[in-house]
Amino acid sequence: MNLLLETIIYGNNMDYLHKCRVLMEYIDTGYYDEIMKAKIYPKIVYYYLKKQILFKEYWNVETQTENLKICEKAIDKLRDAGRTYYLVELLEIEIQILETMPEDAVTEHLEKNETDKINARELISVIKNLYAEYEVPAYMQDCTYFYQQKWIFSMKDVLRTRRAMFGLTQEQLCEGICSVKSLRRAEKGQTDMQRETLKKLLNRLGLSGQMQWSRLITSDREVIRMAEELADYINDRKFSVASKQLESLKSRIDLDIPQNKQYFLEKQALLEFEQGKVTREEFVKMEKEALECTLCAENLYRKENVYLTEREIICISNSWKGMEGKQKRESINLILRLYDYYALNNGLSQAISVYEIVTEAAVNELGNNGEHVRAEEIDRKSIKASLSCRRVWDIHYKIYDILWNEKKLMKKSGKRVSNNRMNTELKRCIIMSHYVKRYFYENVYKEKLS
């Protein structure tokens, strides 16, 4: 779809605008999830409206209103996905359209569409300042966001590292599957194993034989959709609704698959803990049970070199809510060390989705433990990585984290954060949480405004 759009943009197309409209309609009617729509739809709209503006002297109120609706629809798709692809460009176009419309037409449009509106000028100011603060370009320009890979490791490293984590010799791992020579060559990257042989080795190491999967191993698209809804319910802290959704999912997934069972147990543990149905100690045990669906490793937290799946990382980071003392510190350090190592070799953009979740959890625990400077450093590193990937769904949370840790540090030195700074940062939190439709947090920040 992106290549088709690029052909339209840079080719000699007499019906450029019509083809852009066809692509918009196709994206809306085709089977695309929110993330995929956010990646391509705003780009189509941006180039469509950019071309339209060349003819703005011929616009009438109907054309202006239609273009405004198209622009707002593209921005709303970004909001649903928590992304900022072409956001600044679209906001500038929206402002430009509003400035050319008659005042009464603008008023009428706003009155008809007042529900959940965003203030374009206010939002663009916050977005631009945020990107400037973290030294990330605000405009898309020649960004290659379509072509990023996620959480990619060399198979030779996965086999070697995971085998060491399980404490297995090469002979023990390949027993009944393949020759030691084949495994040795695979661990050195000297050969590509047959798919079925590799799948059996990975299964023995607690890994899926599939090269790629999302939250669950299934071919049922409805299950994937339900899992996405479940994640939204948890993000919105609708835990009782999420629990019902999880029960509905349970009957539709194969729990004999270790990764699916791990997903279910991890979600069940989290929801029961958040609803106060289990103690901290019970919660840690439940997360440990979920983790051990795929990983049973002695002295895991003290290992220097590890390979963990994203779901295993989430099981471990969830456990921090119930841990204390040395065990918690070792666990946090293990995960942060894993990401630091990965970033050196691949960059954080390839691991950003779970990195955001993990750093948020780590910062909460470090801040509560009085490690405010380290917590702020991690938050700032995470914000920069998220902005670079055009992801802003939890930026509001991290801005508030930084403010909270700053308050604690100032209090230790006998000082206090000024009301002006408090209100400025809280307003940023309000605007960003509203943008990503996290209304629970938006209301929390509003209550804290002095």
Regions picked out by a protein language model, each given a short descriptive name:
Residues 219-276:
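Helix-turn-helix/homeodomain-like alpha-helical modules used for DNA recognition
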Residues 2-6, 42-50, 89-100, 158, ...:
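"A position-specific structural signal for the A-helix of alpha-solenoid helical repeats
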Residues 4-19, 50-67, 100-119, 230-240, ...:
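Short coil/turn connectors between adjacent alpha-helices in alpha-solenoid helical repeat scaffolds
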Residues 138-165:
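A short, Lys/Arg-rich alpha-helix, primarily the initiator
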Residues 1-2, 30-43, 81-89, 138-139, ...:
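Alpha-solenoid helical repeat architecture
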Residues 164-185:
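Short alpha-helical DNA-recognition segment
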